[in-house]
Curated annotation (Swiss-Prot):
Name of the molecule in the record: Putative antirestriction protein YubI
Pfam families, per the entry: Antirestrict (PF03230)
Similarity field: Belongs to the antirestriction protein family.
Keyword field contains Chaperone: no
Organism: Escherichia coli (strain K12)
Keywords, comma-separated and alphabetical: Plasmid
Amino acid sequence: MQYAKPVTLNVEECDRLSFLPYLFGNDFLYAEAYVYALAQKMMPEYQGGFWHFIRLPDGGGYMMPDGDRFHLVNGENWFDRTVSADAAGIILTSLVINRQLWLYHDSGDVGLTQLYRMRDAQLWRHIEFHPECNAIYAALD
């Protein structure tokens, strides 16, 4: 199978305020902070900074740290590799979406469960054709 960088849309400055509520629903403040916390935990050289918001053509999206490549370590599954900023953003956002999906499923919040289930499926469809899909799969395994 050949991989090509899937089409994505960088969210413009004028749309940044509406992107996170679109992506995470009314849980957006917590979910955004959780992405930053995971970056701090999983990327040893991460010192904070600007994040790009990426919208997928078929819906959903992800957050991506500004930079070229990041060393990412997931102590829960022994993942320890350097990946592109794009792959790092996908990994971190996917982890947050998945954890929030199960949190709201277990608490009985049908609306947020459905939103996170949809966002999870949209991001996985994007990952399937990403040039770094094998690294992303390994990080999320």
